[in-house]
C-alpha cells in the first residue's frame, strides 16, 4: 500500500466492522480490529511496566488484557490505516462471525509473546481464523541473521578468543 494510505483521525476514512487497523507507533505497529460505532478490540501488555514505555513493555510482557476501546483512544496522536493485507492469502471469515468471536475474550487476560502471540496475531486470528504477524516474522528473521553473523565471526576468529591463564 502507498504511503498516502496512512491517515490520522483528522482525516478519517470509515473502517467497516471486521477491518484490521494498523496503528503506527514510534518504533513498531500496533494492531486492532474494528468492531463498529468507533470501537476496536485489541490487546495490551499488562506486566507492571509504566505505560509510557509501551514498546519496551511489549518486549518484556508475558500477559495481555483484551480490551474494547474507542479507536480514537487507541490511536491517540499516532496515525493509522485500514490494512486487511492478508485477505489475498487467507479468506476473511464472515463479518458476523468475526464480531461474535471478538466479543467473548473482552476483559480477559491472555498469554502474550512479542514473537509468537502479539497484537497482530490476535486480530488476524479473529479476522481469518489464523494468527499471523509479518512484523514478528521480520523480527525472528533479524534475530536469526544476527545469530548467524555472530557464529560466522566466531568461526572465522574475528572475535578475540579468551586467553587461558596458566597457574
Swiss-Prot record:
Alphabetic keyword roster: Cytoplasm, Hydrolase, Lipid degradation, Lipid metabolism, Membrane, Nucleus, Transferase, Transmembrane, Transmembrane helix
Catalytic activity field: a 1,2-diacyl-sn-glycero-3-phosphocholine + H2O = a 1-acyl-sn-glycero-3-phosphocholine + a fatty acid + H(+); a 1,2-diacyl-sn-glycero-3-phosphocholine + H2O = a 2-acyl-sn-glycero-3-phosphocholine + a fatty acid + H(+); 1,2-dihexadecanoyl-sn-glycero-3-phosphocholine + H2O = 2-hexadecanoyl-sn-glycero-3-phosphocholine + hexadecanoate + H(+); 1,2-dihexadecanoyl-sn-glycero-3-phosphocholine + H2O = 1-hexadecanoyl-sn-glycero-3-phosphocholine + hexadecanoate + H(+)
Active-site residues, Swiss-Prot/TrEMBL: 30, 119 (acyl-thioester intermediate)
Keyword Cell division in annotation: no
Enzyme Commission number(s) of this protein: 2.3.1.-, 3.1.1.32, 3.1.1.4
Transmembrane regions: 139-159
Family annotation (InterPro entries): H-rev107_PLA/AT, LRAT_dom
Residue intervals annotated with topology Lumenal: 160-167
Pfam families per the UniProt record, alphabetical: LRAT (PF04970)
GO CC, any one term: cytosol
UniProt record, GO biological process: ether lipid metabolic process; lens fiber cell differentiation; lipid catabolic process; organelle disassembly; peroxisome organization; phosphatidylcholine metabolic process; Ras protein signal transduction; regulation of cell growth
Residues in the Cytoplasmic compartment per record: 1-138
Any one GO MF annotation of this record: phospholipase A1 activity
Span of domain LRAT: 20-135
Family stated for the protein in its record: Belongs to the H-rev107 family.
Functional note: Exhibits both phospholipase A1/2 and acyltransferase activities. Shows phospholipase A1 (PLA1) and A2 (PLA2) activity, catalyzing the calcium-independent release of fatty acids from the sn-1 or sn-2 position of glycerophospholipids. Shows O-acyltransferase activity, catalyzing the transfer of a fatty acyl group from glycerophospholipid to the hydroxyl group of lysophospholipid.
Name of the protein in its database record: Phospholipase A and acyltransferase 1
Species for this entry: Mus musculus
Amino acid at each position: 500500500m502507498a504511503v498516502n494510505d496512512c491517515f490520522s483521525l483528522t482525516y478519517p476514512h470509515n473502517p467497516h466492522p471486521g477491518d484490521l487497523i494498523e496503528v503506527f507507533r514510534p518504533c513498531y505497529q500496533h494492531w486492532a480490529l474494528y468492531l463498529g460505532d468507533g470501537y476496536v478490540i485489541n490487546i495490551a501488555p499488562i506486566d507492571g511496566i509504566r505505560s509510557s514505555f509501551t514498546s519496551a513493555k511489549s518486549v518484556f510482557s508475558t500477559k495481555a488484557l483484551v480490551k474494547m476501546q474507542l479507536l480514537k483512544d487507541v490511536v491517540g496522536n499516532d496515525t493509522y490505516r485500514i490494512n486487511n493485507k492478508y485477505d489475498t492469502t487467507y479468506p476473511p471469515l464472515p463479518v458476523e462471525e468475526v464480531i461474535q468471536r471478538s466479543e467473548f475474550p473482552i476483559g480477559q487476560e491472555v498469554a502474550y509473546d512479542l514473537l509468537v502471540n502479539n497484537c497482530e496475531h490476535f486480530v488476524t486470528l479473529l479476522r481469518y481464523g489464523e494468527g499471523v504477524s509479518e512484523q514478528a516474522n521480520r523480527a525472528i528473521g533479524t534475530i536469526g541473521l544476527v545469530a548467524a553473523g555472530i557464529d560466522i565471526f566466531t568461526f572465522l576468529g574475528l572475535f578475540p578468543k579468551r586467553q587461558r591463564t596458566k597457574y
